[in-house]
Regions:
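Conserved AMP-binding/adenylate-forming
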Residues: 1-10, 14-111, 117-120, 133-134, ...
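AMP-binding/adenylate-forming catalytic core of the ANL superfamily
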Residues: 68, 73-74, 94-95, 100-190, ...
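Short loop/turn and capping residues at structural boundaries
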Residues: 11, 19, 132, 148-149, ...
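Generic structural signal for residues in well-ordered beta-strands
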Residues: 7, 42, 146, 194-195, ...
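A short amphipathic beta-strand at an alpha->beta junction
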Residues: 193-196, 269-280
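Short, well-ordered coil loops that connect the C-terminus of an alpha-helix to the N-terminus
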Residues: 4-5, 13, 142-143, 187, ...
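Conserved nucleotide-binding/hydrolysis micro-motifs of P-loop NTPases
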Residues: 15, 202-203
Length: 280
């Protein structure tokens, strides 16, 4: 209670006229942003390999989409891009607005937010919510903080890995944490392949996890392992985000051998000052 007033959570986007859900008095639940407002629609969907949407069942995590007459007409495009015109390309599908948020709707109609769709780990077309991994690891007494991301993988596109801040000064035991995760996470595909110790989870200026830094680290690790396996252990790998994509720069090795070593990974590689190339 603040100044004798109750704070009730809601949820919405400007593109859907701001308010889509609201918590009614007496319906407060941890993590919930309430239920849908009159005239609005909200549901969770999963995205198939072909891009199609499938409605989630009650309590199943998916991407939240908003429907109804409050969904906006579209963005006015830049004249340099052929505008001015109103465009909803890639944002609204069949009247439903892609929020970019992950969440679920329970069997009572309450909506819960769990994360951002861009943080999904997609393993062989299977969507994995990193919160499932993070919550499982945070339940271990040796873990003070945790973050999960996808690591590039030749077979599945990416596989889950986790970064944890140890809770104490004792030795870090990855084997124990992997075994814990194997028991605590019911879905086999969501169990992390590796767990790395880290001094602190990188954060944004507003205190949210900054996962691009962890994605870069995971990519550097997998590229370094591949180069070492190809007898290129002296090669140096660094990572940087350029124009919205992650680019790895490899120095100290023959470009053709580097390309062969990382073949099959969805990585963008630059050998020294050369132009960045997507690995086959």
């Amino acid at each position: 209670m603040l100044f004798r007033s109750h704070l009730l959570e809601g949820y919405g986007l400007t593109e859907a006229t701001c308010a889509t859900t609201w918590t009614r008095p007496g319906e407060e639940r941890p993590g919930s942003v309430g239920r849908v407002l009159p005239g609005q629609q909200i549901k969770a969907v999963t995205t198939g390999a072909d891009g199609s949407w499938t409605d989630c069942g009650p309590g199943e995590t998916g991407m939240l989409v908003i429907g109804g007459p409050a969904v906006f007409a579209g963005y006015v495009t830049d004249p340099a891009l052929g505008g001015p015109r109103v465009s909803r390309d890639g944002i609204v599908r069949d009247g439903w607005l892609d929020t970019g948020d992950l969440g679920q709707v329970d069997d009572g109609g309450l909506v819960y937010l769990t994360g951002r769709a861009k943080d999904l780990i997609i393993r062989g077309g299977h969507n994995i919510d990193p919160r499932v991994i993070e919550d499982a690891l945070l339940a271990h007494p040796a873990v003070a903080a945790a973050a999960a991301v996808g690591r590039p993988d030749r077979h599945s596109g990416e596989v889950p890995v986790a970064y944890v801040v140890p809770a104490g000064p004792g030795p870090f035991d990855e084997t124990e944490l992997l075994a814990w995760a194997g028991t605590a996470i019911g879905e086999a595909a969501a169990r992390p392949q590796r767990i790395y110790p880290i001094d602190a989870i990188p954060l944004t200026s507003v205190g949210k996890q900054f996962k691009p830094a962890l994605l870069a680290d995971a990519a550097v690790r997998v590229a370094t392992d591949a180069l070492t396996a190809a007898a290129l252990a002296d090669a140096q790998v660094t990572a940087a985000h350029e124009d919205g994509r992650l680019v790895l720069t490899v120095t100290g090795a023959d470009p053709d051998r580097v390309r062969d070593a990382v073949a099959g990974f969805a990585l963008t590689i630059r050998c020294g000052p050369a132009t960045a190339l997507r690995s086959p």
